[in-house]
A protein has these predicted regions:
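Functionally critical loop-and-helix segments that line ligand-binding/catalytic clefts
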Residues: 2-19, 179-268
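Substrate-binding cleft of extracellular glycoside hydrolase catalytic domains
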Residues: 5-143, 155-156
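Short, aromatic/basic amphipathic alpha-helical patches
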Residues: 29, 55-60, 173-177, 203-206
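Flexible, glycine-rich phosphate/dinucleotide-binding loops
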Residues: 47, 78, 169, 193, ...
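A generic structural signal for alpha->beta connector loops
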Residues: 66, 157-159, 181, 215
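Acidic carboxylate-rich catalytic motifs and surrounding loops in phosphoryl-/glycosyl-chemistry enzymes
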Residues: 74-76, 162-168, 223
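Active-site-adjacent substructure of cysteine-protease-like catalytic cores
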Residues: 142, 146-149, 168-176
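Aromatic-lined carbohydrate-recognition surfaces of secreted/lumenal glycan-active proteins
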Residues: 153-171, 184-188
């Protein structure tokens, strides 16, 4: 194993893209854009884009460039949505779907070199897309699915975090699940799309600051925006972070290792 996954708190700008950019594009953006974090859609039955570039060598190289990594698993989706692969309404079955997705995500994390040598460590965000919180059965099933995910991830020694909208996190009371969701990647978009240097994970319209308040938040603050930095244009969703992401240590020695104490400004350490 050439890389060891390490979790650290990143404070700064990040982005996600449905299809991961090329190594050359990412290297250019690291030099010229305000972004220092990038999402990795590592897998899941509901992942939209193939992300065929993703493998351990690719991830090692972008970590060597200096990127902070946000592994994300796009598994089954709430049964009251139109997604092709829902988890069941039955809460016991939904819980098991969460467990199974955690097992699959763990295997993929290990394949990509994102875990420690003992198969533990790392953080991965479960992507749960928007659902109708007025549908009580759907809310109950979704809560059970997330509990299955976090329960199994705790057993595996991996931080099983969650991507969801601020409305869903609040109205479905995801903040009071047991075991607790350790960190959240919150979808709440600004009215104006695109990069915003003043974007924050706090003072949101639909989620009080009381929940996930201690370096436990990422936020997707815009979506579907073409941005150009250093002459390279990529369609992205801009994000801001004050929460757990990954860096890689034990990299081959061609470049300095990224410190796990992370800061969003020009790649400098705290």
């Amino acid at each position: 194993q050439v890389s060891t996954g390490q979790v650290g708190i990143y404070k700064g700008q990040a982005f996600d893209a449905c299809e991961i950019p090329s190594l050359a594009q990412l290297n250019n953006w690291f030099q010229h854009s305000p972004y220092r974090g990038v999402n990795l859609y590592i897998g899941g039955i509901s992942r939209l884009c193939a992300n065929s570039n993703l493998n351990e060598a690719y991830i090692t190289e972008i970590a060597r460039q200096g990127w902070r990594l946000i592994p994300t698993w796009v598994g089954h989706q709430p049964p009251c949505t139109s997604f092709k692969y829902p988890f069941p309404y039955d809460v016991d079955e939904a819980f098991e779907y969460g467990v199974n997705n955690a097992n699959q995500a763990k295997d993929r994390m290990e394949t990509f070199g994102l875990l420690n040598s003992d198969g533990r460590g790392g953080v991965v965000y479960l992507d749960v897309e928007s659902f109708n919180t007025s549908n009580e059965a759907c809310v109950a099933a979704t809560r059970a699915y997330i509990r299955g995910w976090t329960t199994r991830m705790n057993e595996l020694g991996i931080m099983g975090a969650l991507y969801a909208s601020s409305i869903n996190l609040n109205k479905a009371k995801i903040y009071n699940l047991s075991p607790a969701v350790p960190a959240v990647w919150i979808a709440e978009w600004n009215i104006a799309r695109g990069f915003n240097p003043d974007a924050s994970v706090y003072d949101l319209r639909h989620l009080p600051n009381d929940y996930w308040y201690s370096e436990q938040r990422l936020r997707q603050y815009s979506g579907e925006k073409y941005e150009t930095w250093g002459g390279v244009t990529i369609e992205i969703d801009p994000n801001v972070a004050d929460g757990p992401v990954m860096a890689l240590t034990n990299l081959p020695p061609s470049r300095p290792v990224v410190s796990i104490t992370l800061n969003g400004q020009k790649g400098l350490d705290d």
